[in-house]
């Protein structure tokens, strides 16, 4: 029997162990997509206890509304163990909340959360034991002592000891980026903290709050909008500002990828109806969103910004809990959509005029991996190796099986050697161990191919592939 999560955890062969320990393990991390707040980096926040880091909490905003923040992966685990909501997003004492989580974690055999938590305990707290209900007090005291007193356990300290070269935050076009500016001007902060341009609220024309958001965008740029191109021009102005602040990527979170034949007139007609409070048909909404996606894609090419597209998520399916807690609190699911025609049409439209940017495609539905893998090869060019990427296994796919499936699909239908690798997509400063887990799985996959005689034991090429996927491909892709 193997020891629990030892140094060769998940590395099944001598070749896998060699590739990981000698090439992948110590390389810097490019975490090009996450949701951590830049303010906490600048202020170098120190957390009081492990529950604050892992479980988040609840605060009342200036307008009196409730805001729930934290790791919804962990919240789902707790709910699945029958934990009352007051211990999850409520105001129960942190020690009691942590106890409930520890008890739930003990039941999470096979869940990636189990691996993530123990990798974090091992790396950041030096704890080699097992967290469950019986050990919760021991772990609570150990973690809190380090969080409160160890100089390396502030936010910046965690980033530094994780060897993070770049953090790609997720930011709205109307954001002032004040914290990014302060970070950029602070010579003591070595990590690159790059804003990412996420204009979802300007594209989601059929969702509640669209008109209110457009008015906020108007205020930021100082003019009123009469047409769809007015929105595009305003977004370009904001994109220019983001690029000045170090932006390297955009991000689009879509329920599904729309594509219909459209033009400025159709998009403007839909825009005017929405601003007047009139309901839109799906076709009208898609005409506007398609027009914006095409226009933004061209701008991303112009400013050398990668275009990330996340889709196939059905959000807030539990309406009772959504109304109580708001979005991003653990009530989303995989959607079944067919993005093949829309995605290929979007890329084809951009390619026709030589205006296709670098694109990273993520589907929450693993059934789409093969389809996306074949799209890649149809639109690659000489701008950069792996210009069109099959995004890392995302969210519910971020499991051992999901990562293997994504990498095997890319290897089978494209070039795994040009993959830009892992991202955390996380709200936690302890989540960089997910890069370790990914690198172990990647080295194990490649190591097995070598050991089985499916790929030669060519040291020079293997080193290049492993180091590229771990770090250098992303460094090149995001021009670090």
Model-derived features: positions:
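Short, basic/hydrophobic alpha-helical segments
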Residues: 346-352
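A short acidic, glycine-rich active-site loop
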Residues: 281-282, 331-337
């Amino acid at each position: 029997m193997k020891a629990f999560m030892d140094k060769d955890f998940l590395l099944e062969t001598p070749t896998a162990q060699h590739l990981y320990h000698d090439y992948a393990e110590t390389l810097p991390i490019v975490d090009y997509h996450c949701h951590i707040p830049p303010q906490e980096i600048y202020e170098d926040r120190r957390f009081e206890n492990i529950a604050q880091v892992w479980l988040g909490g609840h605060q009342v905003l200036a307008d009196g509304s409730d805001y729930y923040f934290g790791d919804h992966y962990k919240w789902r685990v707790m709910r699945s163990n029958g934990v009352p909501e007051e211990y999850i997003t409520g105001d129960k004492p942190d020690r009691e909340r942590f106890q409930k989580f520890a008890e739930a974690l003990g039941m999470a055999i096979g869940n990636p959360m189990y691996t993530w938590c123990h990798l974090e305990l091992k790396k950041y707290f030096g704890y080699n034991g097992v967290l469950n209900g019986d050990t919760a007090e021991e772990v609570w005291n150990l973690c809190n002592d380090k969080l409160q007193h160890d100089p390396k356990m502030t936010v910046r300290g965690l980033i530094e000891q994780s060897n993070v070269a770049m953090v790609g935050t997720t930011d709205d076009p109307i954001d002032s980026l004040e914290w990014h500016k302060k970070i950029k001007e602070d010579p003591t902060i070595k990590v690159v903290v790059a804003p990412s341009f996420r204009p979802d609220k300007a594209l989601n024309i059929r969702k509640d709050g669209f008109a209110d958001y457009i008015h906020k965008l108007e205020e930021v740029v100082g003019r009123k909008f009469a047409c769809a191109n007015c929105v595009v021009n305003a977004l370009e102005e904001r994109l220019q500002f983001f690029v000045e602040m170090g932006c390297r990527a955009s991000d689009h979170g879509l329920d599904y990828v729309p594509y219909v034949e459209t033009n400025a007139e159709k998009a403007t007609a839909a825009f005017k109806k929405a601003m007047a409070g009139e309901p839109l048909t799906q076709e009208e909404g898609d005409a506007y969103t398609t027009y914006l996606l095409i226009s933004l894609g061209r701008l991303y090419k112009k400013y050398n910004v990668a275009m990330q597209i996340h889709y196939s998520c059905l959000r807030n399916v539990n309406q009772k809990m959504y109304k109580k807690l708001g979005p991003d609190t653990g009530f989303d699911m995989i959607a079944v959509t067919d993005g093949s025609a829309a995605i290929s049409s979007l890329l084809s439209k951009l390619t026709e005029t030589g205006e296709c940017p670098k694109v990273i495609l993520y589907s929450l539905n693993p059934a789409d991996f093969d389809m996306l893998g074949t799209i890649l090869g149809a639109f690659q060019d000489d701008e950069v190796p792996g210009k069109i990427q099959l995004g890392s296994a995302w969210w519910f796919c971020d499991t051992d099986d999901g990562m293997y499936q994504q990498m095997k699909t890319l290897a089978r239908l494209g070039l795994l050697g040009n993959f830009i690798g892992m991202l955390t997509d996380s709200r936690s400063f302890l989540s960089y161990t997910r890069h370790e887990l990914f690198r172990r799985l990647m080295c194990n996959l490649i190591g097995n191919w070598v050991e089985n005689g499916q790929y030669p034991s060519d040291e020079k090429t293997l080193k290049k592939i492993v180091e590229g996927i771990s770090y250098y491909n992303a460094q090149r892709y995001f021009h670090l």
